């Protein structure tokens, strides 16, 4: 199997966690080695909150139109290198308003992700810990730009500190506007968080790997056809699994839960999507057929129109 030739879909990748080292060095006029030390998380962090500490530098950099456009274009290049045919890039607009308005932030990133080589759409992140009104603005902006490249919303941040269930009214509001959503759950927090995401009506869950702790939860995911956006390397860094060999992705996949493979944060986790595939082959003997199934499910669970989904499915079929 030539992993580089497999056509891939990535549904869970954070823009601010996937910055190009050379670009950041150029913008800040700081040596690359110093940037790496500040931008790449330890292979073993204490927990998710520890892992999230490295995001201070990316947020500092991404405060102008130029930097948002440039960092977005860089991410497109990394998709091309990984043979990605479709990606949904996520970021939190509220983190980038030191100078810009929310509209300027979003339109800058939308300009940056335009590409003739890779189909890319945007997911806007609400943040745990932000005020209800601030998060509601994100939903309204997702609705405003739904025909311009924004396809959905997410809830991200310190899951262990802010319960998923506290945000159910926001997802009820998003549902009233027919805005699709995914929710980070079952990463720092456990089954309770996943159940709350299911109750909210999420069709996808970011990470969700702690579903392995409950057969009932696994059955719910299967029954409701919910896909888990799994990020193997990141999960090891944040301590969800002690090693890749003990990561629950294979058990979840074998049990019939729909899963997709993602990098989460390409720079913070120091990993490409090709490398994630290689790691999984080594740990679990996944086959090309397995990966093709996962990518087909990723397309089906994407926030694209049915017509766009079918176009991508056809591309996968032609390649397999």
Predicted feature descriptions by range:
Residues 1-179, 188-193, 199, 203-204, ...:
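Metal-cofactor-binding active-site regions of metalloenzymes
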Residues 181-183:
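Conserved hydrophobic beta-strand within the GNAT/NAT acetyltransferase core sheet
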């Amino acid at each position: 199997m030539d992993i580089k030739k497999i056509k891939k879909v990535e549904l869970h990748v954070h823009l601010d966690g996937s910055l190009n080292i050379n670009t950041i060095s150029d913008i800040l006029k700081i040596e690359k080695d110093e940037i790496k030390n500040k931008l790449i998380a330890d292979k073993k962090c204490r927990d998710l909150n520890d892992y999230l500490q490295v995001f201070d530098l990316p947020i500092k950099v991404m405060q102008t139109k130029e930097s948002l456009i440039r960092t977005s274009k860089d991410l497109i290049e990394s998709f091309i290198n990984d043979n990605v045919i479709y990606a949904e890039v996520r970021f939190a607009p509220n983190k980038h308003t030191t100078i810009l308005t929310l509209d300027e932030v979003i339109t800058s990133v939308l300009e940056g992700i335009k590409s003739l080589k890779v189909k890319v759409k945007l997911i806007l992140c609400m943040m745990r810990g932000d005020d209800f009104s601030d998060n509601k603005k994100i939903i309204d902006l997702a609705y405003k730009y739904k025909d311009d490249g924004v396809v959905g919303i997410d809830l991200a941040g310190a899951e262990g500190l802010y319960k998923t269930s506290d945000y159910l009214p926001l997802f009820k509001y998003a549902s009233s506007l027919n805005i699709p959503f995914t929710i980070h759950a079952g990463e720092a927090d456990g089954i309770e968080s996943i159940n709350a995401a299911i109750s909210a009506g999420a069709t996808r869950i970011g990470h969700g790997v702690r579903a392995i702790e409950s057969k009932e939860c696994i059955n719910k995911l299967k029954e409701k056809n919910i896909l888990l956006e799994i990020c193997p390397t990141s999960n090891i860094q944040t301590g969800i699994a002690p090693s890749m060999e003990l990561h629950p992705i294979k058990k979840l996949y074998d049990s019939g839960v729909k899963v997709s493979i993602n990098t989460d944060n390409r720079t913070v986790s120091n990993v490409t999507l090709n490398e994630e595939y290689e790691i999984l082959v080594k740990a679990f003997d996944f086959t090309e057929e397995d990966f093709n199934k996962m990518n087909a499910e990723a397309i089906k669970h994407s926030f694209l129109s049915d017509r766009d989904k079918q176009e991508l499915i056809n591309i996968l079929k032609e390649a397999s």
